[in-house]
Amino acid sequence: MKLNELRDNPGATKNRIRVGRGIGSGKGKTAGRGVKGQKSREGVSINGFEGGQMPIYRRLPKRGFNNPTRKSFAVVNLDRIQKAIDAKKLDATAVITEKALIEAGLVRRSQDGVRLLGKGELSVKVAIEVAGASATAREGVEKAGGTLTVTGAAAEAAPAAV
């Protein structure tokens, strides 16, 4: 078999139907749109219009609000940090900072920094410095003999919860 002999399997592709190309095609004249009326015209559909019936986006109540002070963290779990240490992408002897996590490819840069979550376990002693952390993440780091430093807005806002 050669590259120029490659073909799709029979029935794998369908030819598109060209409408409005004469009565012999079966899709000529009105091109499958029916006869007259708003829907037969060009540029017809008005998004959300339901023929005069109260549209669903007006029948349902408004909910929620956009919080202007919301924090947006990139999240990383303990098990991903451990895998990166095992793969020699992170140095366990140095302090693991947000910059180190980005360079290792564990997180992308985020607006308000990195938040550490507690899924998985650490098997080595590490020092981690992040913008936020869950209680289980703190337990996991301290259980392995490491230290966790929370910097940034999360530490100032709720030191008891972090």
UniProtKB/Swiss-Prot annotation:
**Skewed-composition ranges (Gly residues):** 21-35
Kindly indicate whether the keyword ATP-binding belongs to this entry: no
| Database matches in Pfam families | Ribosomal_L27A
InterPro entries under this entry? Ribosomal_uL15, Ribosomal_uL15/eL18, Ribosomal_uL15/eL18_sf, Ribosomal_uL15_bac-type, Ribosomal_uL15_CS
Q: Return the annotated region ranges for Disordered.
A: 1-44
Q: What keywords does the record list, in alphabetical order?
A: Ribonucleoprotein, Ribosomal protein, RNA-binding, rRNA-binding
An annotated Gene Ontology molecular function: rRNA binding
Q: Which GO terms describe its biological process?
A: translation
A GO cellular component entry from the record? cytosolic large ribosomal subunit
The chain's coiled-coil residues are none
Query: Where in the chain are disulfide-linked cysteines found?
Result: none
- Domain of life according to the entry: Bacteria
Q: Whom does it interact with, and what assembly results?
A: Part of the 50S ribosomal subunit.
Similarity comment: Belongs to the universal ribosomal protein uL15 family.
Q: What this chain does, per the record?
A: Binds to the 23S rRNA.
Q: What is this protein called?
A: Large ribosomal subunit protein uL15
What is the originating organism of this protein? Rhodospirillum rubrum (strain ATCC 11170 / ATH 1.1.1 / DSM 467 / LMG 4362 / NCIMB 8255 / S1)
Lineage of this protein's species?
A: Bacteria, Pseudomonadati, Pseudomonadota, Alphaproteobacteria, Rhodospirillales
